[in-house]
UniProtKB/Swiss-Prot annotation:
Homodimer. This is Aspartate--tRNA(Asp/Asn) ligase. It is an enzyme of class 6 (ligase). It catalyses: tRNA(Asx) + L-aspartate + ATP = L-aspartyl-tRNA(Asx) + AMP + diphosphate. Aspartyl-tRNA synthetase with relaxed tRNA specificity since it is able to aspartylate not only its cognate tRNA(Asp) but also tRNA(Asn). Reaction proceeds in two steps: L-aspartate is first activated by ATP to form Asp-AMP and then transferred to the acceptor end of tRNA(Asp/Asn). GO terms for molecular function: aspartate-tRNA ligase activity; aspartate-tRNA(Asn) ligase activity; ATP binding; nucleic acid binding. The record marks G83 as: Important for tRNA non-discrimination.
């Protein structure tokens, strides 16, 4: 049988036409001997009318039909009787009276409902075990369509900007200073290993040396890391690099791409240019370097106010070089003991010894620490935090970054509690993009007693700060930038180091990587830079994460056709699996199980 139409195409304009449709049985209804089948394909649903009493062959076939069976029908398009139309369907004014039925496959009874409401109530592991059924649900089909449209929009945009798509190797060399890698043993080079590429970073920079000038790729990347709702061991990254560009060029390029994607996929016009916020400002105000600016609840610094405080915890923290910061969670004085305990546990998990707070109830400030506050201190707190009846004020006294992180997390939890009480509305489609810039180039690692690259070692320093590379690396800002949307990092990039002398200095003098290690891991790259490397920069962002936002889901597993679980398993194909002794022997490796 040859399909003449998709199920969603039939309207009153086809009345009287003979059509052939192919698809899955969505539902079956017997109404007084007349059988109605909702036939579904990837485009939509059409109602089919079967009259088995007029056709013996049809009668036998109808007896076999079960939901999710695959069939083909040929019949005439007719108008539905008055009063039986279905306005919820594009095809709701018509039905097809079948003259013939072809059964391609009879389905077993699915282990869970394949409608959105029923499927959403099912344990995710069951859905992933039967992923081929889960993907039949309307929501999941829509997610895959959104993903396709987003990827096409991205390709069209970069093609119009004269970028070329270049594939880079998935099999790379191990660079163990980053995230954990997936190692691939070499059969023909015993004892040696490839690593699955975590990012095309080095290859795309080499392409700039090669004169490509404008490169992009929708690349598969692999990282052996702990999995969360927004992480997968294999993921898709949109990777971009260009020569002879500044940060401003990258901002404009990427904003243009996002503007096109949001318009093409959602028909939403997002305003550009995006606001910009320095890293230090983001941490000070929101307690995180990827702030959700859809709601207020900003942090405030009171270190100067409390440097001579009678409350010794505050006074000693400031004297020791730390800070005292506060957050007014407006309207949350009604937090329960359980909710407060949860927030205290959060603070402790981030290094706090406890959680100091003040509730404002019945016109009083209620807290054991209030007795230490002078009237001028209370007046300053009231003025700057706009303290009112029903508020609760949280404090953090700690080194700057820790204090910011503690209150930043409590800010998000406060917003969640406010939403739960109906006191705050945060729309998922309130698209608040911004750039976070001026990150520190280096971060000091106390455990290793050395500086490490805040992002990666190829980021160029801000030219005015290069003078501090030797004397005070923590003062050096990197030419790095992150694009943030509603509290989620969409992507990040930087202007790169392109001078071999400076790159070698960063590796050896600042990061303290031994010279022989630099040569073995990055020697080819440094060599390439000696042959006329142009100034260059770029950006990369997770396609999975962006599509999840476009679809309004919190898990990227919902927008990947065949994702792994949070334990890194493919429940459908049942991987990973053991391999045979012969396979291990061929690869010159053996397994040693943990005790």
């Amino acid at each position: 049988m040859h399909r003449t139409h998709h199920c969603a195409q039939l309207t009153t304009s086809q009345l009287g036409a003979t059509v052939s449709l192919l698809g899955w049985v969505d539902t079956i209804r017997d109404q007084g001997g007349i059988i109605f089948v909702d036939l579904r394909d990837r485009k939509g649903i059409t109602q089919i009318q079967l009259e088995p009493h007029e056709n013996a062959k049809l009668a036998e076939q109808v007896k076999q039909l079960k939901p999710e069976s695959v069939i083909g029908i040929t019949g005439k398009v007719v108008r539905r009787p008055a009063g039986t139309e279905n306005p919820a369907l594009p095809t709701g004014e018509v039905e097809v009276v079948a003259s013939s039925l072809e059964i391609h496959n009879i389905s077993d009874t699915p282990p869970f409902p394949l409608d959105d409401a029923g499927g959403d109530k099912v344990n995710e592991d069951l859905r992933l075990t039967y992923r081929y059924l889960d993907l039949r649900r309307p929501k999941m089909r829509k997610n895959l369509q959104v993903r396709h449209r987003a990827a096409k929009s991205i390709r069209d945009y970069f093609d119009a900007q004269e970028f070329i798509e270049v594939e880079t190797p998935a099999l790379f060399k191990s660079t163990p200073e980053g995230a954990r890698e997936y190692l691939v043993p070499s059969r023909i080079h015993p004892g040696q290993f490839y690593a699955l590429s975590q990012s095309p970073q080095q290859f795309k920079q080499i392409l700039m040396v090669a004169g490509v000038e404008k490169y992009f790729q929708i690349a598969r990347c692999f990282r052996d890391e702990d999995l969360r709702a927004d992480r997968q061991m294999e993921f898709t990254q949109v990777d971009v690099e260009a020569s002879f560009v500044t940060r401003e060029d990258i901002y404009a390029l990427f904003e243009g791409m996002l503007k096109k994607v949001w318009k093409d996929v959602l028909d939403v016009d997002i305003p550009t240019p995006f606001p910009r916020m320095a890293f230090h400002d983001a941490m000070n105000r929101y307690g995180v370097d990827k702030p959700d600016v859809r709601f207020a609840l900003e942090l405030a610094d009171f270190s100067e106010l409390f440097k001579n405080s009678a409350f010794k915890v505050f006074q000693s923290t400031v004297a020791g070089g730390g800070v005292v910061k506060a957050l007014n969670a407006k309207g949350l004085a009604d937090l329960t003991q359980g909710e407060l305990k949860s927030m205290e546990d959060t603070a402790k998990s981030l290094g706090a010894k406890g959680l100091a707070f003040i509730k404002v109830e019945g016109g009083e400030w209620k807290s054991p620490i209030v007795k230490f506050f002078t009237e001028p201190e209370k007046a300053e707190l009231t003025k700057r935090l706009n303290i009112e009846e029903g508020d609760i004020i949280f404090f953090a006294a700690a080194p700057w970054e820790k204090a910011c992180a503690i209150l930043g997390r409590l800010r998000l939890e406060s917003a969640a509690f406010l939403q739960k009480r109906g006191k705050l509305t945060i729309r998922h489609d309130d698209w608040q993009f911004l750039w976070v810039i001026d990150f520190p180039l280096m971060t000091y690692d106390e455990a290793e007693n050395r500086y490490v690259a805040t992002h990666h070692p190829f980021t160029a320093p801000v030219p005015d700060d290069t003078q501090y590379l030797d004397s005070d690396p923590k003062k050096v800002r990197g030419q790095h930038y992150d694009v943030v949307l509603n509290g989620m990092e969409l992507g990040g990039g930087s202007i790169r180091i392109h001078q071999p002398v400076l790159q070698k200095k960063v590796f050896e003098d600042v990061l303290k990587i031994p010279q022989d290690v630099v040569e073995s891991r990055f020697g080819y790259m440094l060599k390439a830079f000696t042959y006329g490397a142009p100034p260059h920069g770029g950006i990369a962002f997770g396609l999975d994460r962006m599509v999840a936002l476009l679809c309004g889901t919190t898990s990227i597993r919902d927008v990947i056709a065949f994702p792994k679980t949070q334990k890194g398993q493919d429940l459908m194909a049942q991987s990973p699996t053991p391999v045979t002794p012969r396979q291990l022997k061929d690869l010159h490796i053996q397994t040693v199980m943990p005790e």
